[in-house]
Design a protein with these regions (language model features):
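Oxidoreductase cofactor-interface core, primarily capturing Rossmann-like NAD(P)-dependent enzymes
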Residues: 22-27, 42, 118-222
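NAD(P)-binding Rossmann-fold cofactor-contacting core
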Residues: 29-39
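NAD(P)H-binding glycine-rich loop region in Rossmannoid oxidoreductase-like domains
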Residues: 3, 38, 45-94, 98-101, ...
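Conserved Rossmann-fold NAD(P)-dependent oxidoreductase catalytic core, especially the SDR/UDP-sugar
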Residues: 33-35, 74, 82, 86-132, ...
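N-terminal Rossmann NAD(P)H-binding glycine-rich loop of SDR-like oxidoreductase domains
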Residues: 2-23
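Residues at the starts of beta-strands that form the adenosine-phosphate
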Residues: 2, 25-28, 105-107, 143
Length: 224
């Protein structure tokens, strides 16, 4: 697999990058970032790009890939619907519409979230916007897959870029084994989620929209 990763410096992206580099079936990983990851690996190449609404200047470097993992996302708290849509729908589609003609058979995996509203008509703003984004990607890529995780526990030194979020995970992490036991179909971790996403990119997912239980089932299968 030759893969492109957006969002490599975020918590989910960090975990996914780790698993992509460890996976012997992944030969090449390109990360597109606003700031360097600081990660060095023979399989890894990196493009530092400032404008995530316009990829025309680097488009020539984005062809020849089998999969794209799009892990960028922001909270909707404190944002108007117009602002959140620009940071979610518009930003994602800027990358997707650049990649689609270059890699028409690409598997495009988008990290959304459980509770996303596919009807786009619900009362919850973030869920409507995420739903619109998912629907646009499903129309654009025949091999698109939507990733809707629930609670995710960071593993293997993975950390959220946000200091407040890191503190919250440090507190909740103490109870992670209990949460996992109580909610086995809702609580996952960065390693398991990443394995599920890689398998989905290889066409092993049972459907195009994967909820928490689907991701846990797919990610917990032992490697053959």
């Amino acid at each position: 697999m030759h893969a492109i990763l957006f969002g490599a410096t975020g918590m989910i992206g960090q975990g996914l990058l780790r698993e992509l580099l460890l996976d012997p079936g992944v030969q090449r990983v390109l990360v597109v970032v606003r700031r360097p990851t600081g990660v060095s690996h023979p399989k890894l190449s990196e493009i530092v790009h400032a404008d995530f609404y316009d990829f025309s200047s680097i488009a020539a470097q984005l062809s020849g890939y089998d999969a794209c993992f799009f892990c960028l996302g922001v909270t909707s708290l404190g944002k108007s619907e117009a602002e959140y849509r620009r940071l979610t729908y518009d930003l994602t589609l800027a990358a997707a519409t650049t990649l689609a003609p270059l890699n028409p058979k690409m598997a495009f995996l988008y990290v959304s979230g459980t509770g996303t509203d596919s009807s786009e008509r619900g009362r919850t703003m973030w869920a409507r916007v995420k739903g619109a984004t998912e629907n646009a990607l499903l129309r654009l890529f025949p091999n698109a897959c939507m990733i809707r995780p629930g609670y995710i526990q960071p593993m293997h030194g993975v950390q959220s870029p946000s200091k407040g979020t890191r503190r919250a995970y440090a507190i909740v992490g103490v109870a992670y084994p209990l949460l996992r036991a109580l909610f086995p179909k809702s609580v996952t971790n960065t390693e398991e989620l990443s394995r599920a996403m890689i398998r989905a990119a290889r066409g092993e997912a049972p459907k195009k929209i994967l909820e928490p239980a689907d991701l846990i089932a797919l990610g917990s299968v032992l490697k053959s």
